[in-house]
């Protein structure tokens, strides 16, 4: 099993690489790439951790050497949010970065499962799909927008609010990965009920949690460590699916034939081909149905931005 992390010298990439070095199955290969010259050194640093995961680092303009033979590619490359920015402000820089990297993925490891972390995810995933279509290698079951951070935040905040063991909290988060497009389905959480006020405030906190971190870091960065953990959870689920483990389910932003938009975050069953099955997200409350329907114009606009960027 070979996993490649593109953007491995950044805050998310280093956290993700550390977690993968400690969690990937014995005998796996972990390949780190970043434009920054420090990247081979990050790999040397991590190589001193005593786990049976072989690690190599690559720097420079071309990620191809890192991608050869990759089964899973996780892309966190790009610029981070600063105070006063929202995820869409990142588009002007990150769109080009994702396009260029995906062109190399399409040429080097077109069958790999690709997880896009780089924001704005609503748009960068659409860019990746269009690039792969142009290259003639697009497989909608192998491309994912990583929305796991919205899920782990939801699990954490619900457990805190209700005094639950966080390991027992399961929730679907649907829609997209920014602002109003993030929709935690609180009505489905087993064993708890929420007042209307709690639903409104908790939904808003989950939607704005990224901004909470950006502001708390006071210009010193965005959510890198929690995102690294979320990306590792999702990446490990991709690996477990590839290894044939049963019932591996995660929410992800995918081209899953949703009635709502071309790309939509919902639960998917993972397996040897990436997505084995897109799962229904179940019954929703009136509040959730309204929130879902009112986000769609925003979500579709984000997607169109990505499609138009490549065309």
Swiss-Prot record:
Q: Cellular component terms, GO, for this chain's entry?
A: cytoplasm
Among SUPFAM superfamilies, the record links this protein to:
LDH C-terminal domain-like, NAD(P)-binding Rossmann-fold domains
Key words, A-Z: NAD, Oxidoreductase, Tricarboxylic acid cycle
Q: Residues in the active site?
A: 177 (proton acceptor)
Q: Where does NAD(+) bind?
A: 7-13, 34, 94, 117-119, 227
Residues recorded as binding substrate, renumbered to this chain, are: 81, 87, 119, 153
Q: Does the keyword Oxidoreductase apply?
A: yes
Q: Which reaction does it catalyse?
A: (S)-malate + NAD(+) = oxaloacetate + NADH + H(+)
Sorted alphabetically, which Gene3D superfamilies does this protein's record hold? Lactate dehydrogenase/glycoside hydrolase, family 4, C-terminal, NAD(P)-binding Rossmann-like Domain
Instruction: Give its E.C. classification number.
Output: 1.1.1.37
For this protein, the record's NCBIfam families field holds: MDH_euk_gproteo
Q: What is this protein called?
A: Malate dehydrogenase
Species this protein is from: Shewanella sp. (strain W3-18-1)
């Amino acid at each position: 099993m070979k996993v490649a992390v593109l953007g491995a010298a950044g805050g998310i990439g280093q956290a993700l690489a550390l977690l993968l070095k400690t969690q990937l199955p014995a005998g796996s290969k972990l390949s780190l790439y970043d434009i920054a010259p420090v990247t081979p050194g990050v790999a040397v640093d991590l190589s001193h951790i005593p786990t049976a995961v072989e690690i190599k680092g690559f720097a420079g303009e071309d990620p191809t050497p890192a991608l050869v033979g990759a089964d899973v590619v996780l892309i966190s490359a790009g610029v981070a949010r600063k105070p006063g920015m929202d995820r869409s402000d990142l588009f002007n820089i990150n769109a080009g970065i994702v396009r260029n990297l995906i062109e190399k993925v399409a040429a080097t490891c077109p069958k790999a499962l690709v997880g896009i972390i780089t924001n704005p995810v609503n748009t960068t995933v659409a860019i990746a799909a269009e690039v792969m279509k142009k290259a003639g290698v697009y497989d909608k079951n192998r491309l994912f927008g990583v929305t796991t951070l919205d899920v782990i935040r939801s699990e954490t905040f619900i457990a805190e609010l209700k005094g639950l063991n966080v390991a027992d909290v399961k929730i679907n988060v649907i829609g997209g990965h920014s602002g109003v497009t993030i929709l935690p389905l609180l009505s489905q959480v087993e064993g708890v009920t929420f007042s209307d006020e709690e639903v409104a405030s908790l939904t808003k906190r989950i939607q704005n949690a990224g901004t909470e971190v950006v502001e708390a870091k006071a210009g010193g960065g965005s959510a890198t460590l929690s995102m690294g953990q979320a990306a590792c959870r999702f990446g490990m689920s991709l690996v477990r699916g590839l290894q044939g483990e049963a019932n591996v389910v995660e929410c992800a932003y995918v081209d899953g034939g949703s009635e709502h938009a071309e790309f939509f975050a919902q639960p998917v069953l993972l397996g040897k081909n990436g997505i084995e099955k897109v799962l229904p997200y179940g019954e929703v409350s009136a509040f959730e149905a309204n929130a879902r329907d009112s986000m769609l114009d925003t979500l579709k606009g984000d997607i169109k931005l990505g499609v138009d960027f490549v065309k």
